[in-house]
């Protein structure tokens, strides 16, 4: 079953595909992606469109997508409000819990050498990291580093302004 990765114009989307070791990927973005043989692409509305959630769900159902990996913070926040709807259709949003998002309001966009993908607290791809108990029930894509002997982590996101 295919997965959907947003921010399809970004190098982070293709890096995530490599980390996931999946070949059946649909890359989605707000702009038309270049036609690359063997790569499935999709144009989606911007996060602030009234039809964003509806179009994302429709795309998932049309393409039999089982997991969505949003790489833009605004998409994460919009999709978090529709978590139950996607769940009804057995589409997993690979984003942290509402509680985690609420308590991590200073989410920074940064690129890290270390990326881990978690599903309900279990590592499914990426680089193992210390202190898993900090994210023991979370899903999503996280970047992490040890800076001055302190473990730091954040969501793995793209910088919208850079695109």
Model-derived segments and spans:
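ATP-binding N-terminal substructure of ATP-dependent carboxylate-amine bond-forming enzymes
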Residues: 1-91, 130-163
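Short, glycine-/small-residue-rich phosphate/pyrophosphate-handling segment
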Residues: 102-146
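Short, acidic/small-residue loops that bind anionic groups at enzyme active sites
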Residues: 89-105
């Amino acid at each position: 079953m295919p997965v959907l990765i947003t921010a399809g114009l970004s190098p982070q989307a293709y890096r995530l595909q490599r980390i996931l070791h999946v070949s059946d990927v649909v890359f989605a973005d707000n702009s038309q992606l270049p036609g690359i043989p063997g790569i499935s692409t999709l144009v989606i509305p911007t996060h602030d469109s009234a039809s964003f959630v509806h179009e994302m769900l429709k795309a998932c159902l049309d393409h039999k997508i089982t997991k969505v990996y949003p790489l833009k913070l605004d998409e994460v926040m919009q999709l978090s409000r529709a978590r139950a709807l996607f769940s009804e259709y057995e589409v997993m949003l690979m984003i942290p819990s509402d509680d985690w998002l609420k308590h991590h309001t200073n989410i920074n966009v940064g690129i890290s050498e270390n990326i881990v993908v978690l599903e309900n607290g279990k590592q499914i791809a990426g680089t193992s990291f210390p202190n898993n108990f900090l994210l023991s029930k979370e899903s999503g894509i996280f970047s992490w580093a040890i800076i001055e002997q302190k473990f730091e982590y954040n969501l793995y996101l793209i910088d919208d302004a850079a695109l």
